[in-house]
């Protein structure tokens, strides 16, 4: 009796804290390592792109870059990817895309950025044109600072291409629905631990007492930061390619790990590009997925835009901005790991809807609190006169940081793993090209729609700032979050029909 009870306890303990069987480690470990490396690079690039663009230009320019540069680039990528998937294996696509992105990042770090005065319009001429045409000043700034804009755009595309699309497409092909319920939360747990490592690493590299000084003299700290960070990104990208090669040759060919190993991975003829998108357009399921992903991008970008403008006021240089950003990334990693464990148990004990709706609810509540602080800052400070021991600016940055940590923590743990389960029961066409369209385009549509709202306001009112337009952004933010919750509810009903 005791033995049976003991085995039952061990079984329940294993199911809760380590549901991966020993014979599955040959599949689980390399996939977790691949996710770790992709997210490692993603977060270094996230720190660099914001630190460079916002410190070198302004926070307002980010919205224009997302609308007029990032979104067109994302749309172009989806078209190219749909062509590539008909001609190349996943392995080759991963190599080609890695080579393209890393080549530009290296070119920027070692050629363009150190000689930015050669490649960009002279600041005095740019300022003169912007003053002469105030309604078009941000568009002039986009063109005049093209190097920063291209770097920002490619760094923005990295997470949607390499993590959301390529990694999860790889994982969805390799993993069954039953395995996904056990694996995906732990992929997220191990993969997102990279944020903590990146946080500590980039805090050191961007600080005045950086370890780099022990190995080389530093003439310009911001250029050294970008060059050292880019070198690390390039090395980790090579490791990613090695892992993809290993998984393709050793996991996909093993019947123990992959059910289709004996017959080979699907080689059935794919639809043409036009026919493929017509097929996707008819899917209500994918349209709901698109709304959910776009809503996150839209909502979080509204909050982040205001928050990042406040960060620049407090930390005006590239290195100080990067150091603060690194601290934020570190705590985001901690939040993701904690919420991943919570999400795993929520998903096991409740239905998919309960787990999936956590993200939009938390983002809406914390986002509204942040906007209330920005809009009614003087009233709040006078109400708590003497009780708040920091400046209004420092308080806004701190509260915004907490909001973003909680929002990203729930999104990258609970929501991402919940969303990926929605693709598993789909057919191959929707699982590949449909996923590409939803994952790459939707997030950028969300962010660019948010950026479009901001860009229209800044174009019509050149003197506007993020602080002055915060009341408008708060109303839009609330509406978008409610639409996201509604879409999650609707897609849950669709998922139940096919799962």
UniProtKB/Swiss-Prot annotation:
Subcellular location: Cell membrane
Main location: membrane
Recorded GO MF terms: ATP binding; ATP:ADP antiporter activity
Coiled-coil residue spans: none
Record field: transmembrane: 25-45, 61-81, 93-113, 148-168, 183-203, 223-243, 286-306, 327-347, 356-376, 380-400, 468-488
A Pfam entry, by short name: TLC
Keywords assigned by UniProt, alphabetized: ATP-binding, Cell membrane, Membrane, Nucleotide-binding, Transmembrane, Transmembrane helix, Transport
GO cellular component, one term: plasma membrane
Record membrane topology: Multi-pass membrane protein
NCBIfam families: AAA
Family: Belongs to the ADP/ATP translocase tlc family.
Role description: Provides the rickettsial cell with host ATP in exchange for rickettsial ADP. This is an obligate exchange system. This energy acquiring activity is an important component of rickettsial parasitism.
Protein known as: ADP,ATP carrier protein 5
Lineage, opening ranks: Bacteria, Pseudomonadati, Pseudomonadota, Alphaproteobacteria, Rickettsiales
């Amino acid at each position: 009796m005791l033995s049976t009870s003991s085995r039952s306890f061990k079984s329940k303990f294993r199911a809760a804290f380590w549901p991966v069987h020993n014979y599955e480690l040959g599949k689980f470990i390399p996939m977790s390592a691949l996710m770790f490396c992709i997210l490692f690079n993603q977060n270094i690039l996230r720190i660099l792109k914001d630190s460079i663009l916002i410190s070198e230009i302004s926070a307002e320019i980010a919205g224009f870059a997302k609308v007029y540069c990032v979104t067109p680039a994302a749309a172009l990528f989806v078209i190219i990817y749909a062509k590539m998937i008909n001609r190349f294996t996943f392995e080759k696509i991963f190599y080609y895309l890695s080579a393209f992105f890393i080549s530009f990042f290296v070119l920027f770090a070692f050629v363009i950025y150190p000689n930015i005065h050669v490649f960009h319009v002279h600041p005095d001429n740019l300022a003169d044109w912007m003053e002469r045409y105030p309604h078009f000043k941000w568009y002039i700034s986009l063109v005049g600072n093209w190097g920063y804009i291209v770097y920002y755009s490619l760094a923005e595309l990295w997470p949607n291409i390499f993590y959301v699309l390529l990694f999860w497409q790889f994982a969805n092909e390799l993993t069954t629905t039953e395995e996904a319920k056990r694996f995906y939360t732990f992929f997220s747990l191990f993969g997102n631990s990279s944020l903590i490592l990146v946080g500590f690493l980039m805090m050191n590299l961007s600080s005045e007492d950086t370890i780099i000084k022990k190995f080389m003299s530093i003439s310009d700290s911001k250029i050294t930061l970008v060059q050292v960070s880019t070198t690390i990104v390039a090395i980790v990208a090579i490791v990613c390619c090695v892992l993809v090669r290993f998984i393709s040759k050793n996991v996909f060919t093993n019947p123990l790990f992959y059910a289709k190993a004996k017959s080979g991975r699907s080689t059935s003829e794919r639809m043409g590009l036009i026919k493929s998108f017509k097929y996707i357009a008819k899917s209500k399921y994918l349209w709901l997925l698109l709304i959910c992903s776009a809503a996150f991008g839209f909502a979080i970008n509204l909050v982040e835009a205001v928050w990042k403008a406040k960060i620049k006021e407090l930390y005006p240089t590239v290195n100080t901005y990067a150091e603060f950003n690194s601290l934020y990334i570190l705590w985001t990693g901690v939040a993701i790991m904690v919420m991943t464990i919570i999400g795993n148990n929520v998903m096991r004990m409740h239905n998919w809807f309960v787990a999936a709706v956590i993200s939009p609810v938390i983002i809406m509540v914390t986002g509204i609190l942040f906007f209330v602080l920005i809009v009614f800052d003087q009233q709040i400070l006078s109400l708590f006169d003497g009780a708040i021991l920091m400046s209004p600016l420092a308080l806004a940055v701190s509260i915004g940081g907490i909001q973003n940590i909680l929002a990203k923590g729930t999104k990258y743990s609970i929501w991402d793993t919940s969303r990926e389960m929605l693709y598993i029961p789909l057919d191959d066409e929707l699982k590949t090209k449909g996923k590409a369209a939803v994952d790459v385009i939707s997030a950028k549509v969300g962010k660019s729609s948010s950026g479009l709202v901001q860009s229209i306001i800044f174009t019509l009112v050149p003197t506007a700032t993020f602080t002055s337009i915060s009341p408008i952004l708060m109303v839009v933010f609330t509406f978008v979050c409610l639409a996201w919750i509604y879409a999650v509810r609707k897609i849950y009903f669709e998922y139940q029909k096919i799962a």
